[in-house]
A protein has these predicted regions:
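Short helix-loop-beta junction
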Residues: 47-48, 209-223
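Glycine-/acidic-rich phosphate or pyrophosphate-binding loops and their flanking alpha/beta elements
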Residues: 8-20, 152-162, 172-216, 234-237
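Loop/helix-junction capping segments adjacent to catalytic residues or to phosphate/diphosphate-binding pockets
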Residues: 84-85, 207-208, 229-230
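Conserved strand-to-helix beginnings and helix N-cap segments that scaffold or border functional pockets
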Residues: 88-89, 127, 210-211, 233-234
Length: 243
């Protein structure tokens, strides 16, 4: 496991989407008045496939759904608490329910999960999103722990035609996954370190904390639960039985 390269998952994901937009004219990017350096390049080079709907997360979902229903691959980007809680009715009706009738590939990107924006106060805290989004039928919930995993997910998100919620921390994180690690998104988890009697199961940024604990305690296993819905429950239970 490598902990050398420091990057934000947001920047790596957006840069990867930017590169895919050059190859695939069917990819669209929408945001709710929320910026990032990579967005400037997308707006300048692919302005006909970039749309800032303003501070209107509900409309962000509506427009994204419409584009996806016509066959587009859509990435909708906003702060995690706002894209989930403020637009929850639209997500439930237009994405979760409608996608069971017709394939809809809308990828909601929520930056600032958990207490990433702790200094911005409770309006920007996002502690409920996992529970809310896992309730929805036919909805994938992806919670990567490092930028390498977020990067690997891009092509998978293009190919899998269903609504998804991608949540990640806003802060810079170290690299956990290497090219040698064989990650299966269908399984939904990866045993980063094998232990004997104790195993820590974590997701997202907290996987870094779990790794730090294992270094202090010693013989502790670590499972990174990067896919919160769906995941291979049987395989997870079989893995945990060893502890």
């Amino acid at each position: 496991m490598s902990t050398v390269l420091l990057k934000t998952m947001r920047d790596v994901l957006l840069e990867g989407i930017y590169e895919r937009m050059a190859e695939n004219e069917n990819i669209f990017f929408l945001c709710a008045d929320f910026g990032a350096p990579s967005l400037d390049k997308i707006r300048e080079e692919y302005g006909n496939r970039f749309l800032n709907v303003g501070i209107a997360e509900q409309n962000l979902i509506n427009v994204s759904t419409g584009i996806a229903m016509e066959g587009g691959v859509v990435y909708a980007y906003a702060l995690a608490p706002f894209i989930t809680m403020r637009a929850y009715e639209q997500i439930r009706t237009n994405l979760s329910i409608s996608s069971q009738i017709k394939p809809i590939n809308v990828n909601l990107i929520g930056v600032g999960a958990g207490l990433s924006y702790n200094m911005s106060g409770p309006t920007h805290h996002c502690l409920e999103d996992i529970s809310l989004m896992r309730l929805l039928p036919n909805f994938m919930v992806f919670s990567p722990s490092d930028w390498r995993l977020a990067e690997e997910f891009i092509d998978y998100s293009i190919d899998v035609k269903m609504p998804k919620y991608i949540r990640f921390d806003a802060k810079t994180v170290s690299q956990i996954y290497s090219d040698k690690m064989d990650v299966n998104f269908e399984d939904g988890f990866f045993e980063i370190k094998r232990g004997e009697k104790v195993c820590l199961v974590s997701t997202g940024f907290m996987t870094h904390r779990a790794i730090n604990v294992s270094k202090m305690v010693g013989d502790v296993g670590i499972i990174d639960m990067f896919m919160l819905n769906p995941f291979n429950e049987k395989l997870l239970f079989e893995t945990l039985k060893r502890y």
